[in-house]
Amino acid sequence: MKKITIIAVSKNRNINNIEEAIRSGINNFGENYLQESLIKIENLKKYKNITWHFIGKIQSNKTKKIAQNFSWCQTVDREKIAVLLNKFRPKNLPPINVLIQINNLKELQNNRYIDQYQELAQLILSMPNLNLRGIMAVPSIKTNVIENNLQYEKIKTIFNRFKRQYSSVDTLSLGTSVDIKESLLATSNMVRIGRNIFNI
């Protein structure tokens, strides 16, 4: 039975909310907003077994703080961000775990778009302070079942291709509170859950 990692999406949650989740056994937290997350990371340093994932949109001017404070960055979608994360990752920390965010699901059947992601993967693999772990995607929820299933099949296909090509790839971050079933069928092994964990 495969292991599923649950990321508690803790944006807009306070320190007490997160501590309650920690006491319930959650130890992976996903943050979208950098300034908010830095306050939480600082105040929760006493918990040595928790892991912080950055899951928000990345701007270039935020890469330094992300590289310094997070164990995972799930939203790397272009070369510039990878280069800056590698540059700013402190030498006394292990390489930051990186997921490539797949943005344009409509175009995944076009080899040109797949090639772009593979070029980004090759760049990340060449950088000593980055550890390529897989891909992350956020499908749009379609009312048309066929269209909906096709998105997940596309993501599964590119993930399997990455796994065959790159030995470090082992993570597909796919799935939220609204599409867990579809995501697990697409072989996701990391899901991002917010309301269903914090219940507020």
From Swiss-Prot:
The keyword Protein transport does not apply. The modification N6-(pyridoxal phosphate)lysine is found at residue 11. It holds the Pfam family Ala_racemase_N. Gene3D superfamilies: Alanine racemase. InterPro entries: Ala_racemase_N, PLP-binding_barrel, PyrdxlP_homeostasis. SUPFAM superfamilies: PLP-binding barrel. One of its GO terms (molecular function) is pyridoxal phosphate binding. It comes from the Bacteria. Keywords: Pyridoxal phosphate. Pyridoxal 5'-phosphate (PLP)-binding protein, which is involved in PLP homeostasis. Belongs to the pyridoxal phosphate-binding protein YggS/PROSC family. Monomer. This is Pyridoxal phosphate homeostasis protein. It comes from Buchnera aphidicola subsp. Acyrthosiphon pisum (strain APS). The lineage of its organism: Bacteria, Pseudomonadati, Pseudomonadota, Gammaproteobacteria, Enterobacterales.
